[in-house]
Amino acid sequence: LQSDLQPKYEAIDTDWAFLNLRSVPGMYRSIQELGEIFDREDQAQKLVDEFTEFYDDYKKKNEGKDHPKVMILMGLPGSYIIATPNSYVGSLVELAGGENVYSDTDQEFLTVNTEDMKTKEPDIILRAAHALPDQVVEMFNKDFAENDIWQHFDAVKNGRVYDLTYEYFGMSATFKYPQALEELQPILYPESDEDSAKAKETSDNAQKKAKDSDATEKYNEQQSK
């Protein structure tokens, strides 16, 4: 998007700025830049300090723990792609202490076949939805039930496949990241049966919320206007 728009903005000789919403730290760097542009540096720094304090406390939860290997599937209607650490969802998992099995790239998303995914052997598979979450969750359920290769993944065998709440795990950074990190905590670092049960309950609730979103119906209504 930036590569397309930047030459146009430069051509009309106007003030412009692009926000980095691919990660939480990127969002706060953008906030600092906006504070400088609009002479609101104190307010911007206050937000940055709040994030720094929050994240310093959050990191202490998982100090010294082994980082689980995680694969993130970003679902689209009819297909899915791999989310890398350069995407917002990937950055959240990284902030939470997960090790993304597709980290050796500068791309946000990758198209990869399941055979290659199997070679990565993730401990955990996370499923997120971008656009029409009601369709995406049904697609994931169907594919994992009917595509035999999934049954050979350790994450599937061990019951460590989780759906993520679509409002928290989208394409762009938002101030809902604390809720996202809280959701990831029992998924990535279950320390008790209670944590494991909470992770499954959260995943089930994410599925239900996606199914109840009526996103497809709302989209079709908009298209018909």
Feature locations, PLM:
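Short, solvent-exposed loop/turn elements at domain surfaces
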Residues: 78-83, 127, 134-135, 170-173
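Extracytoplasmic substrate-binding proteins
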Residues: 5-78, 99-102, 157-222
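Acidic/His-rich segments in extracytoplasmic proteins that coordinate ligands and/or metal ions
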Residues: 1-37, 112-152, 186
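Serine-centered coil/turn micro-motif
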Residues: 86-87, 147-148, 153, 174
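Small-molecule-sensing regulatory modules
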Residues: 94, 112-115, 168, 182
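Histidine- and/or cysteine-centered catalytic micro-motif in compact active-site loops
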Residues: 75-77, 85, 105-106, 122, ...
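His/Asp/Glu-enriched short active-site or ligand-binding loop at hydrolase and phosphoryl-transfer sites
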Residues: 86-109, 129, 163
